[in-house]
Every structure is written in C-alpha cells, then in structure tokens.
C-alpha cells in the first residue's frame, strides 16, 4: 500500500494500517491469521530528494560519515547491536533528515542510500517478524525529523522519543562510574599476576585513577588468546592465589575493583563444557568455545549465579560484561527446541540482563556494570551504567570519535 509517500508491504498475507502518531511519526500496524510463513517481514520504502545532504551518522558509523549507496549492504540493529537511528546532515552540521524506529529490541535492517537514477536518497526498511506464541499483531512507529537544527539536537530528540514510545530508561550511574578508570588490557593482556597488578594500581592511584578493570587472563594460565578456558570463572592460582585478599589490597589504595567476564563463552577446556555443549547458539572453533544460548533457563541461571558468587566471595565493585553482541539475533539462531522457555534470542538476552541487574543491585546498589560498542542502544542501556568504545589499540582518533558517538 502507498500511504503518504510510504510504500508499505508485507511478504505474507497481512492487513496493514498506517496512521499519524505525532509530528513526523507514522505508526504501522500489521494483523494476520496465525499460520506457517517463511521469513515473514514488513517492508517500508520511500524516497527523499537529495538536497543539501552531505553526510550520514549512525551509532556505529565510526570515522566513515560518507553517504552510502542504495546497493550497499543494509545496517542491522537489534537489542544488542547499535541503535535504529540515522541522521543525514549538511556541511554546516544541520539536520536534513533523521530516521528513527521504535523497535529497539528486535532485528531491523536499514538501507538508506543514494539512488543515482533520480538523485534521491532511497530509504528501505525491513523488519523480520517473529512468528512466536499466539502473536498475530505487530506495531512499530517510524519517526522522520526534517527540522532545521543541529544534528546532535535531533539525536537528543530521538533519545527522548525512545524513552516515551519504547519505555526505555537508563540504569542509574554511580559516582564512581564518572571517575578515572584504569583498564589492564593494554598493559598486561592476559598476563594478569596479582603482584604486578597491585604494583600498577599503586601508580594508577597516585595518578588519580579510582577504579581498576582487570581484564581477560585472571581466570586462566593459558595466555594464547581464544576463550577455551572460559566458563569456570575461578582465578588461576599461579596468577592470583587469593582473590579476596588481592581485591582488599587494591581497595586499600582507594580504588574500586571490576572484573572481566566473557558472558557468552563456555570454553572447550572448562569443567562446564559437558553440561552446556548442547545448549549453544553456535560453536566458535577459532575461539575453542561455544556461545551459550540464553533461551535455556539453565544458561541464564548459571550466568547469574556466577556473578553473584563472585561478588559475594571477592567483594567486587563491578563487572566488565563482554561480548553480549555475540549472542546475535533470532534469525541466525538454531530452531526452538525442548527445554527452552523463550523463542527469541533478543527477549532471552533481555531477560538474562534483567536478572543480572536485579541480583547484583540487590547486593550492591552502586554496582558498576560496563558494556562496550556495539551494544549501546536505548534498550540495553537499562542494564549497564558504563559504556566504552570498541577496541582500537593505539588509535587515538578512533577512540575520540567513538567517545563522541557514544
């Protein structure tokens, strides 16, 4: 159907209704008869004259602000990857078109690029529709801002709009999250020996750092990368023989202590491999590890229990929860099977993080939880209170750009 310049369609039998939901807002609702449909999706297409538009920004664009073409691969967004907002602006930094979507949890595919034949910006949006349970209705709101304002002002409007229409709210930020942090990764990589860490923390504390984030390596004597030894989450005794005493010595320096966990991985060499090797989204042979499937309640319970026990046993102040974006999306996941209590990966990850947040804040209300790009969207920010730029070793420019983008 064509509705005020929008071509809206579904690739399966569905009734479509469009209506204005506010200035620049279009609410699209689909209803259908429950049945078996192959890769059902909602498609929305429209064109915008390419006038006074020179640049494009979206949350994971990095240093590339160039306009894309209509044949470029679409940008994927989901609960744990990016955010559904795209801003097109001119040389002066003035907004010419900002596109946002109320769907901040499930997968969306965005293709907004130059169409050479007629000099327009061809906008194509695809939303795979989950056919789970008894769902026979789906609504989504498309926001298009054309006001002449600074593009960062348009983005602030989108952030406020998300809170209103998607019921997303950030996790409270403790004071400690705003103070200087020292991360051990580039200093030590996996060579995280307690005495060396404590010596570095002495210097860090003198320079004003108030928290240390001890990264990958504390849990294994193997320092050859990969994640084959993740999953047991006990300190390597030859590196950190007494974790609680080690944390206490860092606390005595006036620093808080955060610990790294690769949330998704259970390693082939861990004691838990036999338990969880049949509860995986996929097996990463390079990493020598499996990616846990959070649709199984046993997986979620194991992860929550792991963090709760660590917090209690070692008096930690926070967690660096890594690789959450590696859970991926439902369209790439194995079929639903017996033992799962969720059909959608995105919903299961949301449930996992809800349980983690509630369990940890019940024990320590000012707990620090760090996430990184790419999982920085409006829905996931309710579960973390520190967000960092993706790894960019010795690349100060990418780091600065990433900080601004965050």
Question: Where in the sequence are the language-model features?
Answer:
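Aromatic-lined carbohydrate-binding/catalytic grooves of carbohydrate-active enzymes
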Residues: 178-182, 186-308, 312, 316-318, ...
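Glycan-recognition surfaces
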Residues: 268-289, 293-301, 305, 347-406
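Hydrophobic, Leu/Ile/Phe/Ala-enriched alpha-helical segments that form helix-helix packing faces
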Residues: 32, 75, 86-92, 101, ...
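N-terminal accessory beta-strand-rich subdomains and adjacent acidic, glycine-rich linkers
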Residues: 1-161, 168
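Terminal accessory/anchoring regions of large secretory-pathway or extracellular enzymes
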Residues: 146-174, 178-180, 189-192, 196-201, ...
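Alpha-helix-loop-beta-strand connector modules within alpha/beta enzyme cores
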Residues: 241-250, 255, 341-366
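Structural alpha-beta junctions
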Residues: 37, 50-52, 207-209, 253-254, ...
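Short glycine/threonine-rich loop-to-helix capping motif typified by GTGT followed
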Residues: 333-344, 382-384
């Amino acid at each position: 159907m064509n509705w005020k310049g929008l071509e809206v369609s579904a690739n399966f039998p569905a009734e479509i209704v469009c209506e204005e939901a506010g200035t620049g807002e279009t609410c699209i609702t689909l209803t259908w008869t429950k049945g078996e449909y192959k890769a059902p999706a909602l498609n929305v297409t429209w064109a915008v004259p390419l006038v006074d538009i020179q640049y494009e920004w979206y949350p994971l664009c990095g240093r590339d602000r160039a306009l894309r073409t209509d044949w470029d691969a679409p940008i994927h967004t989901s609960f744990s990857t990016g955010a559904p907002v795209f801003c097109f602006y001119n040389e002066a930094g003035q907004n010419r078109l900002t596109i946002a979507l109320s769907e901040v949890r499930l997968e969306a595919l965005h293709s907004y690029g130059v169409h050479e034949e007629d000099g327009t910006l061809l906008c194509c949006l695809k939303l795979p529709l989950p056919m789970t349970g008894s769902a026979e209705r789906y609504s989504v709101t498309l926001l298009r801002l054309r006001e002449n304002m600074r593009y960062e002002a348009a983005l602030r409007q989108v952030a406020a709009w998300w809170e209103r229409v998607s019921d997303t709210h950030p996790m409270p930020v403790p004071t400690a999250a705003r103070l200087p942090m020292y991360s051990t990764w580039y200093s030590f990589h996996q060579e995280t020996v307690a005495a060396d860490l404590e010596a570095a923390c002495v210097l860090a504390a003198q320079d004003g750092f108030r928290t240390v984030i001890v990264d990958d390596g504390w849990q294994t004597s193997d320092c050859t990368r990969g994640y084959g030894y993740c999953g047991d989450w006990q300190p390597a005794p030859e590196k950190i023989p007494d974790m609680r005493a080690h944390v206490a010595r860092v606390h005595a320096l006036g620093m808080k202590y955060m610990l790294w966990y690769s949330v998704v991985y259970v390693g082939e060499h861990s004691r838990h491999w036999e338990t969880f090797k049949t509860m995986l989204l996929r097996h990463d042979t390079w990493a020598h590890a499996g990616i846990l499937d959070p649709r199984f309640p046993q997986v979620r319970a194991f992860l929550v229990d792991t963090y709760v026990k660590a917090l209690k046993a070692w008096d930690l102040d926070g967690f660096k929860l890594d690789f959450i974006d590696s859970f991926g999306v439902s369209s790439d996941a194995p079929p639903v099977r017996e033992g799962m209590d969720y059909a959608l990966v995105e919903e299961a990850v949301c449930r996992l993080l809800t349980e983690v947040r509630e369990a940890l804040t019940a024990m320590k209300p000012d707990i620090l939880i760090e996430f990184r790009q790419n999982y920085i969207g409006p829905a996931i920010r309710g579960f973390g209170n520190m967000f960092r730029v993706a790894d960019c070793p010795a690349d100060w420019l990418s780091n600065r750009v990433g900080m601004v983008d965050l």
